[in-house]
Amino acid sequence: MTKRPSPTGEYAVGTFTYTVNTNRDDALAPGHKRNIPARVYYPVLKESVADLTMAKYMTENMAIGLKKTMHVPVNFKKADAEGDNFSECYENAPKIEGKKFPLIMFNHGLLSFREGNSFLCIELASKGYVVISVGHPYDAVCTEFDDGTYVFAMKGIQNKQYEPMLGGFFNAYKLIKYNGDNRELAEKFEELQQNYCAFVRSRISEWEKDTMNAIDYAKENLSDMIDFEPGIAACGHSLGGATAYMLCFDKPEIVCGINIDGAPFGENHGRIQEKPFLQISCTGNLKAETRVFIDHKAPAYSVVFRDMAHVGFSDMKHMIKFNSLTGKLDADLMHENLCNCFTEFFDTYLKNTKEKPDIQSNDVITVTEYAPDAE
C-alpha cells in the first residue's frame, strides 16, 4: 500500500460510514434482509484536521477477502505495522458549518469493495463534492457494517459472469473481434447479455435499489452538508458504472453519470438516454461499451485510456504491479487524467459552473463527443 495520490483540491477530506437496514429480501442470502453500508467522503477545512489522525485504508477482513476471492496479495499486517495502512482522509472530521456541497453517488465493481476507488472519491471531495460510496453485500470481496459484522463474497460468484461460462467467454471474444459501428456493436453486446449474463443483469436492479436506499438515508440525515438542489450524479467502476447508466434512465433525481470501463448491463435496449453521460474505457473493452454513444438526447462522451486494463481504474493501480490486470500506464498519469475527466464533467453537469467539460485528447486519453442522435 506504499504509493497513494494526495488530494489536490482546496479542501481536506473527512469520512464516516453508515448502514441502512432495509426490509428487502436478499437474493444472495436467502432468509436475510439486505443491509447497505455506505462511506461518505466530504470536504472539510484543512486547518480543522491539523491535529487529527488519518483514517485507516483497509481492515484485515478486507485484505482476507481480496486474497480469498481475487487472489490479490495484500500484506495487511506489514502495512499496518509500518504505518502504511492509511487513507488521505480523516474520520469524523468537523463539517464546515453552513456549507453544503453537491452529491456524487459511487458504486464499486463486482468483486471490488466500498473503498476500492477511494483515491478518486477523496480527490472529488477535495474539489467540493460530497461522495457516497455504496457497498454491495455478497457482491463485494468483503462488506463491513457499522455494528462490526462483515460478510465475504457469495461463494462461486466469480464463476457467474457468464452462464454457461465457456459459451459466454467465446461470444465475448467474438464481440471484441467484431468490426462494426457503435450501433452494431451495441446490438452484439445486447445478444451477449441476454443469452449469457442473466445473473449479472439481475444484480443491476438490486444495486440501483442499494443506491437509492443510501440516497434516502442521506436525504433524511445529511441535508446539513449536501446540496440536493442541482440533483445527484451517479458513477461507478465496472458493474457500478453500468448501475450509474441505468440510474440515469430510471431515477429523475439523477442528472448525469459516468461509467468507468463497465459494459452496459441492464434493461436499456431501445431506451433513450436523456442525461449527459461519460463512458471511460480501456481499448480492450471499448467494443463492449458503445451503447452509451447511441440513442441519447443529451451529450455523450467517450474517453479511451491507452495502456490500461480493467482493474487498473481502481486503487489497485497503485497497489499491485500486475500489468495484465492493471495495465502498463503509469499509476499517477492514470489518476491525474481520470480525476480531470470527473471534475470537468461534474463541474459542468452537476455544479453547473461550466458550459462544457474541458477534456482534451492527449498522449494518455482519446476523447470523443457524440452529439445527440434522438429526438
Regions found by a protein language model. Name each.
Residues V255-D315:
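The feature captures the conserved acid-bearing segment of alpha/beta-hydrolase catalytic domains
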Residues T2-P5, E10, N23, P252, ...:
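Alpha/beta-hydrolase-fold serine-hydrolase catalytic core, especially in secreted/extracellular enzymes
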Residues Y42, F106-L110, S238, C282:
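Glycine-rich His-Gly loop
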Residues D80-E144, G266, N285-K287:
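Short substrate-entry loop that stabilizes the transition state in hydrolases
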Residues N213-I272:
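Primarily recognizes the serine-hydrolase "nucleophile elbow" in alpha/beta-hydrolase
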